[in-house]
Amino acid sequence: MLRVTIRHYYDFGTDRAIVGDDLVRPDAWDRLRTKTSGVFAIPPTREEFVQTAEGRADIAGRARAIDAWLEGRGARVVASYGVGGAALEWWLHKLRPRRKLIVTDYGEGTVQRLVETFPEVVVRYHDLRRDEPLAADVHLFHRIDTELGNREWQEVFTRFARVPILVVATEVLDLRRLLLELRLRRRMKLRHATKAGYIRSSAAFEALWRPTHTSHPIRMHDLSSWELRPRAVGRTDSARGLSHTYEPLPERRVRTRAAEPSDVIDHLRKGDRTVGGLSRHDEGGLQRPDP
């Protein structure tokens, strides 16, 4: 499939009044994590936090796959970014408690809640949009790909150009999903869905890090993933503050009207495009984001 990036929307139901019209902001995520009680919330007590994490069999299987991969690479220190509810990180710690695990988020309320409920790990405030990588053997980007636009991600990979990364994708866009997203856009035009970032095709993912990293596609249990290795070999790690000179690739974007299937074909024929889309978690088997 060609390089395609589409805007993603999510219907939070009654929680939309708490989240607002755009999820991809630290204050919106904080409200969703600490002011709601649904699947996205971080439980307020340690007991509830553990109970919630242990109940996620899907995440447990994914964590085992990631743990095995980390062990195969001898990773003693792992930094996981934008962890949110941190169910995956709880499983990673349970599976390998001697491995140092640093978890980060850019919502201050989320960070505070994690400090209170997940004392076994190191919790740090970190904003991927501007901060340098932390000191770690491997840097884990687990289901945070929807959070940033293409140009923002290219800037992230430029700052992380000297470090190895494991990218575990929220979802990889294929033609079937693209058609479904665009059809749903018409049906939900008048609904109050919240902007929830972007979803991408495999080619669009790989274009983000091509200037800075080589990549190898792998499968982490239920999700498509990539192992990224720095192109710059034998130079100072970017976690030590070295500046970079990589030039981000330009981002091209096209807006569509209420889309028909013919629109999709037109966009695909034109090559790398960003198009508008709308999805809902309870229709058509669409992906529900992990908390």
Positions of PLM-derived features:
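A short, conserved alpha-helix within the catalytic core of class I
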Residues: 147-160
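Short catalytic micro-motifs in class I SAM-dependent methyltransferases
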Residues: 143-144
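Class I (Rossmann-like) S-adenosyl-L-methionine-dependent methyltransferase catalytic domain
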Residues: 1-76, 81-120, 125-132, 151, ...
